[in-house]
Design a protein with these regions (language model features):
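An aromatic/glycine/proline-enriched structural segment found at the starts
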Residues: 22-31, 225-289, 449-488
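Short acidic/His-enriched helical or mixed secondary-structure segments at domain edges of catalytic enzymes
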Residues: 164-183, 260-279, 316-325, 370-423, ...
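Scaffold signal of the M16-like zinc-metallopeptidase fold and its non-catalytic homologs
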Residues: 22-28, 97, 140, 172-221, ...
Length: 488
């Protein structure tokens, strides 16, 4: 027995030694390519009663039920004299109750079931989302459709909501980052629905009748797309939704015209005085829509310029090399049916504001004038290829992606062709779109900070700021009245 044990131990050590001898250095390890093919949206698309469209997937992995109603309505459809209606709607669709249910009773019942029911209003799309256990599907779905179809907007919760929002206006100018993004867009977009802000008068002017009229105009079966997933059979859920949607009138919603003409602001420095020890900066101009054929090349280009975190040029220069900031980069924002914005951004101490801006502008020029490297291209393209599957991590996320495609009118093969379009981007295309969509000579430089130390500068970049362009002093808007406040 003793000899047997010794032999076994010896064999074990020999095998272990062989395994160690065969082990590779981590740098030599290879992994198979990640292969993920998004499903075909058409396989999940159904139409329920009244023309109510949906993308539906059975998912038996957990005993859950999820449904989201994506509605084509939002803040851009609200008239100027009712600015803030979307925010009130977002708060009151559930809290205001329905014809047969009190709002607090709905919230308490959802909490008791361990579920969630939420409503959000965006610029052109709003969403009502429910998540409950499969055993509570019938009760949860009934409440979901009751809220979606029959909101009551009761006076008492509406009164409290308006008072709360008016009070919150007092803090509208407190956060420099909030002020920066709001006023930057005001300069670039001008006076239209994109930049209209609620005031005390517009909040207080919103009535229950206004909310009912807005709801009646946009909440109809042909203006809603559902995303549905969970532990159910498709046929069974169809019968339930058909029953709950029966009799829901589907009128033809009319949508206000979106702004098409925008101002051409004078390039230069637009300064907002705030007694803080840092400067918050955005510099840029209007960008493009995400339906633009150049979108994919622009995404790769911006990743290299400033969107790729620690691998990007702006972060490398401003943060790693110069140590000026923890928050810097560049971004293209996108809006459905409207051009987004392009901006470089940085948050840095007052004395280095001018220097940081000069470094970012130099990177704008460099990516326009010099080809990017092979390594930069590989990193950027691999980022988009390797992160592509993240948008499909759950059945509900996948159905929401498909619902958004249909809502915004993008082709159903958008995700199937996404990676090939990214892979088709070349170094020449990166330089081409940089020259086409980045215009340093037309850039607005918006700064929120303390003017005197920002204007003075520091050792590496002594002021004044007008070396960057003509200085425009911008007065803040009084959020209560919407009128300009005079700087002391």
């Amino acid at each position: 027995m003793k000899r047997t044990i010794i032999a076994i131990l010896a064999l074990t050590f020999i095998c272990a030694g062989l395994g160690l001898a065969q082990a590779k250095h981590p740098s030599e390890l290879t992994y198979p390519a990640l292969k993920y093919e998004p499903p075909d949206p058409k396989a999940f698309r159904v139409v329920y009663a009244g023309g109510l469209r949906a993308f539906v997937q059975e998912d038996r992995s957990l005993p859950l039920f999820n449904i989201t109603a994506l509605v084509n309505c939002g803040d851009l459809y609200v008239p100027k004299d009712k600015a803030g209606l979307g925010r009130i709607l977002g708060d009151q669709l559930i809290k205001g109750g329905t014809a047969t249910r009190d709002g607090s009773a709905i919230e308490e019942r959802i909490d008791f079931l361990g579920g969630s029911l939420n409503f959000m209003v965006g610029e052109r799309t709003s969403s009502l989302s429910l998540s409950v256990l499969e055993k509570d599907l019938d009760e949860g779905l009934a409440m979901f459709f009751d809220v979606l179809r029959n909101p009551a907007f009761r006076e008492e919760p509406l009164k409290l909501a308006k008072a709360r929002f008016v009070e919150q206006l007092r803090q509208a100018n407190d956060q420099p980052g909030t002020v920066l993004s709001r006023e930057y867009e005001r300069i670039l977009y001008g006076d239209n629905a994109v930049t209209w802000q609620a005031t005390k008068a517009t909040f207080e002017g919103v009535t229950a009748a206004d909310l009912q009229a807005f709801h009646a105009k946009y909440f109809s079966p042909r203006n809603v797309i559902l995303a549905v997933s969970g532990d159910f059979a498709k046929a069974a859920i169809k019968a339930k939704i058909d029953k709950l949607a029966a009799g829901w009138k589907s009128g033809a919603a009319s949508f206000p015209a979106l702004p098409k003409a925008f101002p051409t602001p004078e390039p230069g420095v637009y300064f907002i005085q705030k007694a803080i020890n840092q400067g918050y900066v955005s510099l840029g101009h209007l960008g493009l829509e995400d339906t633009n054929p150049d979108y994919f090349a622009v995404q790769v280009m911006n990743f290299i310029l400033g969107g790729g975190s620690f691998t990007s040029r702006i972060t490398t220069k401003v943060r790693s090399d110069e140590g000026l900031s923890y928050n810097q980069g560049s971004r293209f924002t996108y809006r459905w049916g409207l051009p987004g914005t392009f901006s470089g951004y940085v948050q840095t101490k007052s004395s280095t504001v001018g220097y940081a801006i000069s470094l970012i502008r130099a990177e704008f020029d460099r990516i326009r004038k010099e080809p990017v490297s092979d390594a930069e291209m590989e990193t950027a393209i691999n980022y988009y290829l390797e992160s592509f599957a993240d948008g499909f991590q759950s059945a509900q996320a996948t159905m929401m992606s498909f619902a958004n495609l249909e809502m915004t009118g993008k082709p159903m093969d958008y995700y199937r062709t996404f990676r090939s379009r990214i892979q088709a981007v070349t170094k020449a295309r990166v330089q081409e779109v940089a020259q086409k969509y980045i215009h340093p000579d037309k850039a607005v430089i918006m700064i929120v900070g303390d003017f005197e130390p920002c204007n003075k500068g520091g050792d590496k970049w002594p002021g004044p700021l007008d070396k960057l362009g003509r200085i425009h002093k911008i007065n803040l808007i009084d959020p209560m009245t919407g009128l300009e406040m005079k700087t002391p």
